[in-house]
Amino acid sequence: AAFDPAVEGVQVKDATYRIYRDTRFSKDKSPYKTWFGVYVCPRGKKSGFSGYYMHVEPDQNHYMLCTGAYCPTAGEIKSVREEIMTEGDAFVEAIEAATGFEVDWSSALKRMPQGWSADDEYSDYYRLRNYILVKMVDKEYFLRPDAIEHAAKDMQCTREFNHSLNRAIEYA
């Protein structure tokens, strides 16, 4: 919250996900999840807003920092696309300012969505279904004594990207 007043006041319970399930009467005592995730965004993880996500999964040696909107609704996607269409330069500048982060193209559409022009300068961004910037990190990143402060410092450069998404999501 130090670098983004929009997430000030978010409680821990509104940013974390449960790991364990009720195993009292089950033979299978394995946890519900084998990873730990924290999602800090305005009004909490269930708000639908874009935010900052930290993922730690030791079993798979999978560690990452993310910023953005994961699984937005159809209306929110349309609103973000309209934001890109009208404020494309600012959107691309926000992505470029996010040093060390890359756009996640893994769930992008193969073709241009219906009703959107492929001739537009920013048309590639219309194909995205999740508007996320990702930074893969290693285990040592989170073993540092100042890991949280370091993660916050890294995510600070993604603030403008988040703000542009949240402007569009709030409008949707």
Where are the model-predicted features located?
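Aromatic- and glycine-enriched beta-alpha-beta binding-site module
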Residues: 22-85
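A structural signal for alpha-helix termini and helix-coil/disorder junctions
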Residues: 2-5, 86, 90, 97, ...
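A contiguous pocket-lining binding segment that forms or flanks enzyme active sites
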Residues: 64-114
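Gly/Pro-rich turn-and-neighbor structural signature
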Residues: 1-28
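N-terminal low-complexity, intrinsically disordered segments
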Residues: 10, 23-31, 139-142, 149
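Long, solvent-exposed, polar/charged low-complexity segments
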Residues: 1, 104-172
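A residue-level signal for beta-strand positions that form part of recognition/binding surfaces
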Residues: 16, 35, 130
